[in-house]
Design a protein with these regions (language model features):
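Auxiliary, metal-adjacent structural segments of Zn-dependent hydrolase domains
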Residues: 1-45
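Sec-exported extracytoplasmic/periplasmic mature domains
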Residues: 5, 63, 84-93, 163
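Surface-exposed patches in mature extracellular/periplasmic domains of secreted proteins
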Residues: 8-17, 67-73, 91-102, 170-174
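Short pre-active-site segment immediately N-terminal to the catalytic Zn-binding motif
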Residues: 35-54, 65-72
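Active-site recognition of the HExxH zinc-binding catalytic motif
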Residues: 51-68, 77, 81, 85
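Short acidic, glycine/Ser/Thr-rich loop/turn "cap" segments at secondary-structure junctions
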Residues: 61-70, 137-143
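Post-HExxH zinc-binding segment in Zn-dependent metallohydrolases
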Residues: 73-120
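Pan-zinc metallopeptidase signature
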Residues: 120-176
Length: 176
């Protein structure tokens, strides 16, 4: 089905992580008139965190959620990280025009988030992916790692290119 035809419910929930739940992977949703639930766990007044989480989780929806090959799930997680970075950056354009009081806080959030991961050049990112491939393939969501540094490092690198040519976002619809 086309993305515009999808019913998406966005809800706040009280857990330690946000999540996207597609109908195709959840039997309890079979009789519900919704295709995806997106659960966010940030506070209502934490705009930057809401933007970050929503961009990440909505990217899973755009990609049809998770790839069939579990070993490739790290790619979708890194693309979602890129989307979060991209949306945080363009949110400042919106805030400057409509809610200037949020610009400084959003920029501070973005800088703080980006500082938690490495900044690598082309050869550096290739070496990084090669050196971490085993971990990327077996633990794409970095479940036992605080802050998801592998996904953040790769997503941050990819975001630089997507920010230059936003047409690149069209490609993520084909990753499933």
């Amino acid at each position: 089905a086309e993305l515009l035809d999808q019913m998406i419910s966005i809800q706040k929930w009280d857990t330690s992580y946000p999540m996207t739940a597609p109908k195709r992977l959840n039997l309890y949703m079979r009789n519900m008139d919704v295709d995806y639930f997106i659960f966010l766990n940030s506070n209502d007044d934490e705009w930057s965190q809401n933007i970050y989480q929503l961009a990440h989780e909505y990217s899973h929806v755009v990609m049809g959620c998770y790839p069939n090959n579990e070993r490739l799930k790290w790619i979708s997680e890194c693309l979602c990280e890129s989307a979060s970075i991209h949306l945080l950056q363009i949110a400042n354009v919106f805030f400057e025009k409509h809610s200037p009081r949020y610009v400084a806080g959003n920029q501070e959030y973005l800088v703080r988030h980006l500082s938690k991961s490495q900044t690598l050049d082309f050869q550096g990112i290739l070496d990084y992916i090669r050196g971490n491939m085993e971990y990327l393939e077996c633990d794409a969501v970095e479940s036992n790692v605080d802050g998801r540094p592998r996904n953040n490092t790769i997503g941050k690198y990819w975001a630089r290119f997507i920010n230059v040519n936003t047409n690149g976002w069209k490609a993520i619809r084909h990753f499933s």
